[in-house]
From Swiss-Prot:
Function: Substrate recognition component of a SCF (SKP1-CUL1-F-box protein) E3 ubiquitin-protein ligase complex which mediates the ubiquitination and subsequent proteasomal degradation of target proteins. Recognizes and binds phosphorylated sites/phosphodegrons within target proteins and thereafter brings them to the SCF complex for ubiquitination. Identified substrates include cyclin-E (CCNE1 or CCNE2), DISC1, JUN, MYC, NOTCH1 released notch intracellular domain (NICD), NOTCH2, MCL1, MLST8, RICTOR, and probably PSEN1.
Placement of WD repeats on the sequence: 377-417, 419-455, 458-497, 499-535, 538-577, 579-617, 621-658
Record's subcellular location: Nucleus, Nucleoplasm; Chromosome
Record's keyword terms, sorted: Chromosome, DNA damage, DNA repair, Nucleus, Phosphoprotein, Repeat, Ubl conjugation, Ubl conjugation pathway, WD repeat
Bias kind Basic and acidic residues: ranges: 32-54, 129-138
Gene responsible for this protein: FBXW7
Keyword Repeat: yes
Keyword Secreted: no
Residue ranges of domain F-box in the record: 277-323
Single GO term (MF): cyclin binding
Disordered, as annotated region: 1-157
The protein, known as: F-box/WD repeat-containing protein 7
C-alpha cells in the first residue's frame, strides 16, 4: 500500500493533480460530489420510512425518554456530520482558493521544482525500462484482483476522489489517523519530531480489529442501518475464525460478490483509512532516514514527490552520500543551480553528484555519439604509448617525440623534443611526464612548460616499461635490469639485477617491485635492499603483462595462461586458462580481473575463486587481436586491430555498442591504445599500411547540469 501511495503522489504531480488554478474543473467536481451526497442522504431516509412502516411506527415521532441508543437518532447524527463535513470542505476550499491567489508566484516556483524532480525520476525510469514494465504489470494484476480495498490509480488521482477522501477522513473522528494528502499540500508534520498522542500497541496487530484498536478507533464502528444484528451472526463469526486462511479468503470473495455497491463502499470507508497512515512522519528523523536508506535511488526520487516532509527527508545530504559511496562516486562537484531553492528545501550536493553520474553512465550506454575531436599529429608514425589525466593527454611515438594535448579544445599544447630514438613507454602525474626511449634514456619533463628537467642515464638498451609511484619511478629495460630513480633529483637509487632476458613489464606500489620478463619468470623485489624476495616460476613462455594490488600478482604470458600469485609466499594460487593466445593487456580492481587476448576475446575473472565470470564474445565480438582495455564498475571498453572500440556490460558480459568504428577497419586501420576517464574516451588510431591517418580521437560523454 505504501508503494501505491508513492505511485499516486508521483502520478498526481506529473498530471497536474492539484485543483488549484482550475476553478471551472473544481466547480464541476463539487456539483458532482453534491449530487452523490444527496443520493446517499436520501437512501437512509427511504430505508427508515420503510422500516417504520413495517413496524407500525410514525416517521418523525419523538423518541421515548431513556431510549438512548435509538438507531434513528444515530442516523440523524451521522447525516448532520455529513452536512457539517461538506460545509467544512466548502469553506476549506474557499480558504485554499484565497491562499492560492496570494501565493501564485510561490506555486510557480514549486511547479518548477516538481518538474525538476519529475525529470530526475524520468532519468532513472528510462534507465530501467524492463523493471518499469514489470512494475506496470504488477500494478495491473493488483488492480484486477478481487481486492476491494485498492482503487485503480487513475481514480485515486482524480480531483473527485481527492475531495471525497478528505470528506471521508473528516467523518473518522480518530485524531490518531493521520490525513495523507494526495495532492501538493504539505504534510501535517513539518518538523523532525514524532507525533505524540498515539495509542501504543502492546503487540503486533493480528486482526483488523486489533489494527483499528491500535489506531485508537476500536469503539468507532459506524452503523449505516437501524436493523439490529441478525441472529446467528456470532455463530457465523466463530465459524469464520475456525477456518483456514485460504478458506477465509474464499468466504470473503463470496461475501463481496454478494454485496451491493453501497455496502462495498462502507467497507472501503472503514478499511482504507487504516492503510493510508503516513508512517514515515511518525518516526524520528534518524529512523525515517534509516528506512529510506533501503530504497533504490529511483525510488527515493519518487518518494520525494509524495509530500513536502518526504521531500525534505529524501533530499538529506548524508543519505545521498551513502548512495554515492555504494557507487564509488567521489566528492560532488559544485553544480550551478538554475534558480535559488525556496526556503525550507535544502539542496543536496551528493544527490546532484549521483544524478550526474547516472546521466553520464546513460550517455555511455546509449547517448548520441557526437563527432569526436580529432587530434592530428605524429604524421604517419605509430603511437606507442598514451597517458590521459584531467584535461591533459600525452602521446608518445616512434617519431622520437611526445605531444601534450588539451582534452577540452583538442589543440596540441606543446611537443616534447629531446629523445634520439623512438619513445616506447611513458608515465604522467600532475605536471610531470616521464618517457623511456630506444635511446636507452629516461627523460623527466615539465608538462606546463615542455622543459626537460632531467635525463636519466644508466640502462644499456631500450627502456621498454616503467611504473611511477609518488616521487620514484622504476624502469625495466631490454638489458634485463630494473632501475629505481628519484624524479626530483634525477638520481638512480637502486639497480635490480636477476633476470636473464629483457624485462617486458613492471609494477611498483612504493614497497615492492614486481617484474615480468622474456625469461618466463616473474620476480618480486625489495627495492631498498635490492634483493629478489621471490621468483615466481610456472610460465612456459614470455611474460608480457602484469598486475599487482599489494596482495596478489597476476601475470599473463605467451603460453596462453594467466597465473595468480600470493606476493608474500610466492605460491601460485590459481592458473586461469581459457585464452588461446598471448594475453596482451590486463586490468585488476577489487579482485576482478579483465584480460584481453590476441585470440580476439576478453574475459572477466574472479581472482579469489579463479572462476571466469564472463567471456565477451558473440556475434559482436572483435574480429582481430585485442590491443587495449579499460574497465570500471559498470563497463568494459576494448580496442582491437579490427579498427573498433567496443563497450560491454561488466556484470552481464553483454555487448552494448561500438563507440568507434574506423572506415579502414579490417583493411589496415588499427586502434592502438585507449584511455578513459569518467566522462571522456581517448583513442590512438592509425595503420601500418597507410590506410588510416595517425591521430587521436576524443569522445565526450559529459552532461550539463546547469
Amino acid at each position: 500500500m505504501n508503494q501505491e501511495l508513492l505511485s499516486v503522489g508521483s502520478k498526481r504531480r506529473r498530471t497536474g493533480g492539484s485543483l488549484r488554478g482550475n476553478p471551472s474543473s473544481s466547480q464541476a467536481d463539487e456539483e458532482q460530489m453534491n449530487r452523490v451526497l444527496e443520493e446517499e442522504q436520501q437512501q437512509p431516509r427511504h430505508q427508515e420510512e420503510e422500516h417504520a412502516a413495517r413496524n407500525g411506527e410514525v416517521v418523525g415521532a419523538e423518541p421515548r425518554p431513556g431510549d438512548q441508543n435509538d438507531p434513528q437518532q444515530g442516523q440523524l447524527e451521522e447525516n448532520n456530520n455529513r452536512f457539517i463535513s461538506v460545509d467544512e470542505d466548502s469553506s476549506g476550499n474557499q480558504e485554499e482558493q484565497e491562499e492560492d491567489e496570494e501565493h501564485a508566484g510561490e506555486q510557480d516556483e514549486e511547479d518548477e521544482e516538481e518538474e525538476e524532480m519529475d525529470q530526475e525520476s524520468d532519468d532513472f525510469d528510462q534507465s530501467d525500462d524492463s523493471s518499469r514494465e514489470d512494475e506496470h504489470t504488477h500494478r495491473n494484476s493488483v488492480t484486477n484482483s478481487n481486492s476491494i480495498v485498492d482503487l485503480p490509480i487513475h481514480q485515486r488521482s482524480s480531483p473527485f476522489y481527492t475531495k471525497t477522501t478528505k470528506m471521508k477522513r473528516k467523518l473518522d473522528h480518530g485524531s490518531e489517523v493521520r490525513s495523507f494528502s494526495l495532492g501538493k499540500k504539505p504534510c501535517k508534520v513539518s518538523e523532525y519530531t514524532s507525533t505524540t498522542g498515539l495509542v501504543p500497541c502492546s503487540a503486533t496487530p493480528t486482526t483488523f480489529g486489533d489494527l483499528r484498536a491500535a489506531n485508537g478507533q476500536g469503539q468507532q464502528r459506524r452503523r449505516i442501518t437501524s436493523v439490529q444484528p441478525p441472529t446467528g451472526l456470532q455463530e457465523w463469526l466463530k465459524m469464520f475464525q475456525s477456518w483456514s486462511g485460504p478458506e477465509k479468503l474464499l468466504a470473503l470473495d463470496e461475501l463481496i460478490d454478494s454485496c451491493e455497491p453501497t455496502q462495498v463502499k462502507h467497507m472501503m470507508q472503514v478499511i482504507e483509512p487504516q492503510f493510508q497512515r503516513d508512517f514515515i512522519s511518525l518516526l524520528p528523523k534518524e529512523l525515517a532516514l534509516y528506512v529510506l536508506s533501503f530504497l533504490e535511488p529511483k525510488d527515493l526520487l519518487q518518494a520525494a514527490q509524495t509530500c513536502r516532509y518526504w521531500r525534505i527527508l529524501a533530499e538529506d545530504n548524508l543519505l545521498w552520500r551513502e548512495k554515492c559511496k555504494e557507487e564509488g562516486i567521489d566528492e560532488p562537484l559544485h553544480i550551478k543551480r538554475r534558480k535559488v531553492i525556496k526556503p525550507g528545501f535544502i539542496h543536496s550536493p551528493w544527490k546532484s553528484a549521483y544524478i550526474r553520474q547516472h546521466r553520464i553512465d546513460t550517455n555511455w550506454r546509449r547517448g548520441e555519439l557526437k563527432s569526436p575531436k580529432v587530434l592530428k599529429g605524429h604524421d604517419d608514425h605509430v603511437i606507442t604509448c598514451l597517458q590521459f589525466c584531467g584535461n591533459r593527454i600525452v602521446s608518445g611515438s616512434d617519431d622520437n617525440t611526445l605531444k601534450v594535448w588539451s582534452a577540452v579544445t583538442g589543440k596540441c599544447l606543446r611537443t616534447l623534443v629531446g629523445h634520439t630514438g623512438g619513445v616506447w613507454s611513458s608515465q604522467m602525474r600532475d605536471n610531470i611526464i616521464i618517457s623511456g626511449s630506444t635511446d636507452r634514456t629516461l627523460k623527466v619533463w615539465n608538462a606546463e612548460t615542455g622543459e626537460c628537467i632531467h635525463t636519466l642515464y644508466g640502462h644499456t638498451s631500450t627502456v621498454r616499461c616503467m611504473h611511477l609511484h609518488e616521487k620514484r619511478v622504476v624502469s625495466g629495460s631490454r638489458d634485463a635490469t630494473l632501475r629505481v630513480w628519484d624524479i626530483e633529483t634525477g638520481q638512480c637509487l637502486h639497480v635490480l639485477m636477476g633476470h636473464v632476458a629483457a624485462v617486458r613489464c613492471v609494477q611498483y606500489d612504493g614497497r615492492r617491485v614486481v617484474s615480468g620478463a622474456y625469461d618466463f619468470m616473474v620476480k618480486v623485489w625489495d627495492p631498498e635492499t635490492e634483493t629478489c624476495l621471490h621468483t615466481l616460476q610456472g610460465h612456459t613462455n614470455r611474460v608480457y603483462s602484469l598486475q599487482f594490488d599489494g596482495i596478489h600478482v597476476v601475470s599473463g604470458s605467451l603460453d596462453t595462461s594467466i597465473r595468480v600469485w600470493d606476493v608474500e609466499t610466492g605460491n601460485c594460487i590459481h592458473t586461469l586458462t581459457g585464452h588461446q593466445s598471448l594475453t596482451s593487456g590486463m586490468e585488476l580492481k577489487d579482485n576482478i580481473l579483465v584480460s584481453g587476448n590476441a585470440d580476439s576475446t576478453v574475459k572477466i575473472w574472479d581472482i579469489k575463486t579463479g572462476q571466469c565470470l564472463q567471456t565477451l564474445q558473440g556475434p559482436n565480438k572483435h574480429q582481430s587481436a585485442v590491443t587495449c582495455l579499460q574497465f570500471n564498475k559498470n563497463f568494459v571498453i576494448t580496442s582491437s586491430d579490427d579498427g573498433t572500440v567496443k563497450l560491454w556490460d561488466l556484470k552481464t558480459g553483454e555487448f552494448i555498442r561500438n563507440l568507434v568504428t574506423l572506415e579502414s577497419g579490417g583493411s589496415g586501420g588499427v586502434v592502438w591504445r585507449i584511455r578513459a576517464s569518467n566522462t571522456k574516451l581517448v583513442c590512438a588510431v592509425g595503420s601500418r599500411n597507410g590506410t588510416e591517418e595517425t591521430k587521436l580521437l576524443v569522445l565526450d560523454f559529459d552532461v550539463d547540469m546547469k
